Amino acid sequence: MADNRRTSEYRRRDFLKKVATGGALATTGPLLRAAQEASAPTTGKPAASEAAPAKARARITYPRTFAGRGLKMIAFPLAGVGTGTISLGGRGQLRDWEIFNRPDKGNSPDYCFASIWAQAKGRRAVTRVLEARIEPPYEGESGLGANNVPGLPRLAGATFTGAYPFAQIDFHDAKLPVQVRLEAFNPLVPLDAEASGLPVAILRYALRNPGSAPAKVGLAFSLQNMVGKEGRQAIYREDAGVSGLLMSNPMIAASDPLMGTMVLGVLGAPAGTVSYLKGWKRAQWWDGALTFWDDFSADGALTRDAPALNPVGSIAVTQTLAAGAEAAVTFLIAWHFPNRTPERCGWEAAEGKGKSVVGNHYCERFKDAWAVAQYVAHELPTLEGRTRKFADAVQASSLPPAVLDAAMSNLSTLRTNTAFRTADGEFHGFEGCNDQRGCCHGSCTHVWNYEQATAFVFPTLARSIRESEFLRNVRDNGLMGFRSYLPDGLQIWEAAAADGQMGCLMKLYRDWQLSGDSDWLRRLWPNAKKALEFATIKGGWDADHDGVMEGVQHNTYDVEFYGPNPLCGVWYLGALRAGEEMARALGDEQSAGEFRHLFESGRRWIDANLFNGEYYIQKVVGRKSEEVAAGLRVGMGGADPMKPDYQMGEACLIDQLLGQYMAHVVGLGYLLDENNVRKALRSVYRYNYRADLSEHEAVQRTYALNDDGGVLVASYPSGKRPEIPFPYFAEVWTGLEYQFAAHLAFEGMYAEALNVVETARRRHDGERRNPWNEPECGHHYARAMSSWAVLVALNGFHYSAPEKRLTLAPRTRTSNLRSFWTLPSGWGTFAHSQLVAGQKAEIRATEGSLALASLALEGRGKARPAVKLGIETVSASVREEGNWRVIAFDREVSVAPDRPLVVTLRV
């Protein structure tokens, strides 16, 4: 698909930047015009939806828009990194309140909803719950029950637009005399985990009076206090820029996991516009909701509290809009729940420590939820401005919209309960989330191997995991536990995963290359070296020291592979190359030479013995139990190690070249024969890609079916499938699909890469599946953040901080690329253009900086460079290195926000 296909269908960049960040009632200029142009008219008819019939769902836009049936499954995470999350539903409702130190799908307060009251001068007032109408089914033991008042009138329809971290809902209702739109977000700033780690949901309702007469408008938000049960209370507070209800419970035990505070607030409301109820009237039946609705429906404001209060509080802002006027009301919900324990969240603990409070990092920053609200009120203009700069940079990219959509939508995983930070600031991750517990604890090495988002967007968090892996989870003999316990460092997991351990070595190399922090590498290197040498212990993966893993290899498919196979074998080759480079950088030439020898031996053997002419296969070799080193068998594979079940055999495996993919990400080049690598990728695409799965047979977990398309984990083109193959062979995982797509892109197979990404994202259309939740073993699965690697591959923007060298080689099919970059030292944008006689690169820093000694561009032959750093001319020379022209600057240059680098190369 041509890159320019993304721009014509959705012209709403204004939605990412036109709402003022100041006062709640601030005039916002042409606030809703873009929405009016792009949305359905206010007749109640839904706009065109992503949930149209399958044959019509061929294109994905960015931002992405949903309506009608496409609203059903939407749950858009609103939260910071490591804070828990609340999700915004497609109709405008808040759902899945997962802020209490564990996943909690389906959890909701009995009452949580926004309301609107509007009266045009001389007309009858209209009162509505500020959500689109509830869609079928309506069946339950009490119908839909009374919670969240499903029987109250709602708006006729809505259109949802998502470009993470911003969500926008345009509501439609012909009977409402004003137009209303919701914009919801939480600050997200690349590289700044603190600014991106705030426990708050920001809900900004934008209003416009399209009529010829003034209209009085009231907006209210009601929320039940969820801090325990008996003893809940709320107090009203006003502070600089924020008014609201601080909800707490003085009767709850200090150690209770639900002990904490919440805030329902409004930002920047002028004096006299705010009214509130600390609690609804306490009465029998549903009198509290009835009394609130009667009160608000009278005039769009709230009267004072009744003497006896129930735990539902409300806050309202009432104003008059002149004809044609626009305004915005910004609500926030903040929370503070410090008592995270391993047992409650689903993390396996060190012996006897299941109930130990490991805490939350955000709770160390703020004393309670009111402190969060105060901070946000003061800092929001800056935080939102920084967030919008990032969102604008993403949206301005000329990369295909499906690639942007996949990368940004899965970035939300870092802000769900899949990931958290303990009180000491350490970063940890489940594999995913079950409905009420984390799924598969321990920052699992073989799952987190695939994703690239953390290292590129929040590198300090990636380095936190590296420190846990190498400083606290490596045994004296080099065995790295492939899961970690909490509290971290008290106990080491008993087993190693071959792919996980080798992948961690490549990730260590990646994080060093991105940061250039050799002191940090030196601190981790002793255990890293042990972890690599562990492969060659007696009874180990490569006990005969030939660079090939023949031993018993536990891996990400939750079984042990017996004998040489490409999945673990190529990871090993990549780890050997990474080990060689790190050893050499630290002055350990002997180890570097040994690792290189093993690498050369292993690559020759794998190409000669595992490549069948089309792809790489496994040679199954049984082992006697007594020949297997301790810690290599987890017990999830076959019972007989001499005749093991659950092998891949002659499968065409989607991630058979996973280590090669990672080698491209980190700049280590080819680990295997280049032609064989490309043949294998073509074979995976030929044999495993399905445009339609209606005839696909699978008894396993089902993530794609019927007319969905997808890429199978494995196929058996030769027909030689083991009677009992490895368990997941017939499944479809987005985390593998994106990794495969990224590798296709690295190899120049652009059309195939894009088709894989588009196919995966079409499955998440809002009707069939939530576009912001790609599951595998649990919701919000970490592996799916491999979607960020597709950006990395297509951008071709590779940086080595130790060398201060940037290699720029876009892998798109256009002669001009605009995109963005993120590195530990800063982030910004870049452009690359092919000229009639040469090429041009322009690199800008939005925040931070980028130090460069040289820039490498693809091409051969003599060329003349012209280099500008801001307004300054920089001298440079050009040398050829294979297929590259390397522009060496006469001095180190630093790209900064006020100093863009422009390099023109003419031949």
Task: Identify what each model region corresponds to.
Residues Q93-R95, N101-L182, P187-A193, A704-D707, ...:
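Non-catalytic C-terminal accessory modules of carbohydrate-active enzymes
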Residues E194-S196, R204, K278, W293, ...:
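The feature captures the catalytic groove of carbohydrate-active enzymes
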Residues D435-L479, Q501, R522, P526, ...:
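Active-site core of glycosidic bond-cleaving carbohydrate-active enzymes
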Residues Q36-I60, T65-G70, I74, Q168, ...:
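Acidic/polar, glycine-enriched structural segments that form the non-catalytic walls/loops
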Residues S115-A120, A125-V129, P136-G145, N209, ...:
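Aromatic-rich carbohydrate-recognition surfaces in CAZymes
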Residues L16, G44-A132, A407-N410, L414-N417:
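Beta-strand-rich N-terminal accessory domains
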Residues D14-E37:
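N-terminal export signals
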Residues M1-R11, Q36:
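N-terminal secretory signal peptides
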